[in-house]
Amino acid sequence: MAPSQLAWLLRLAAFFHLCTLLAGQHLGMTKCNITCHKMTSPIPVTLLIHYQLNQESCGKRAIILETRQHRHFCADPKEKWVQDAMKHLDHQTAALTRNGGKFEKRVDNVTPRITSATRGLSPTALAKPESATVEDLTLEPTAISQEARRPMGTSQEPPAAVTGSSPSTSKAQDAGLAAKPQSTGISEVAAVSTTIWPSSAVYQSGSSLWAEEKATESPPTIALSTQASTTSSPKQNVGSEGQPPWVQEQDSTPEKSPGPEETNPVHTDIFQDRGPGSTVHPSVAPTSSEKTPSPELVASGSQAPKVEEPIHATADPQKLSVFITPVPDSQAATRRQAVGLLAFLGLLFCLGVAMFAYQSLQGCPRKMAGEMVEGLRYVPRSCGSNSYVLVPV
């Protein structure tokens, strides 16, 4: 009796184990997340943010509507208000996709540089703090390209006025005109303007760099105004009406130029020792007979500063969410069912082999059966046991 009960218990345990393993095999293609039992009433389109179709495994086709509070409702796709809501949400999603938005990213902290000749202002003077004295302004080289003259033959034209370095009289200074140089030969004089772009290193050095510049420059080449006063007065702004209020730096025009072509030297070696933070751009403005400064600064061996444009990129807003409905794969589901069935059959085979081995081990040979007496046979209870059971033959 005991071996048979143990065998039945093993069979029941194996059966329940197989039922547990194969409980979901017949639902291999079922991916229905929301089961719709009741359809909802009409919902205003202003409260809806998204819709999607339910899965094919759900059986009854329905539209899943999602509200702003992320609640889901089932709706009948055949109703008119459901179709209008779907069109409204499709139009809203398409508009958001076309107008994805724009963000700008700054690559570095480079600020756009303004050409001094076209603006008429010096970048260093614009960036000067309010506490700067007039001495710093007078010692600062301007970035304005001075008006150059090209006298041909015996032509006499008044050059641009020079503040603080013009050899004209006070009456000519009040009128804004300098002395007229006379030349019998062909001469070409180019006004040299040294443009210094502002940097943090130049700002930190302060006025000591400008004092060093004044000490190293040669007096006959560049004449700097030596006025130093902390209070500005209208009398210091002497010159033509087109000149800026601060003092300008200009090379003095030589009156005697026997050569056919002469250009004033450019002193840039004092700016080369200022470190990597400061960049010196020597520029030579071509001569012209007009009284307006040249709009372009052309320098041999130097390029115009390039302004890096910010990078524009388009990106979808974070609120725009794309819901991808998974499509059930019939082949994968069939493959899973086949694997489960094979596993079930293999487990049954193993269980049968185990039961057969158990019965063969527990069985007793025929010689161990007792003798038959008067139609009754003595059968031992188990192999090797001394207790017998009388079995009628």
Swiss-Prot record:
Pfam families: IL8
Phylogenetic classification of the source organism: Eukaryota, Metazoa, Chordata, Craniata, Vertebrata
InterPro entries the UniProt entry points to: Chemokine_b/g/d (IPR039809), Chemokine_CX3C (IPR034127), Chemokine_IL8-like_dom (IPR001811), Interleukin_8-like_sf (IPR036048)
Xref: SUPFAM superfamilies: Interleukin 8-like chemokines (SSF54117)
Disulfide bridge partners, by residue number: 32-58, 36-74
Organism: Rattus norvegicus
Processing and modification events after translation: A soluble short form may be released by proteolytic cleavage from the long membrane-anchored form.
Protein name in UniProt: Fractalkine
Stretches for region Mucin-like stalk: 101-337
Gene giving rise to this polypeptide: Cx3cl1
Gene Ontology terms describing biological process: angiogenesis involved in wound healing; antimicrobial humoral immune response mediated by antimicrobial peptide; autocrine signaling; cell adhesion; cell chemotaxis; cell-cell adhesion; cellular response to tumor necrosis factor; chemokine-mediated signaling pathway
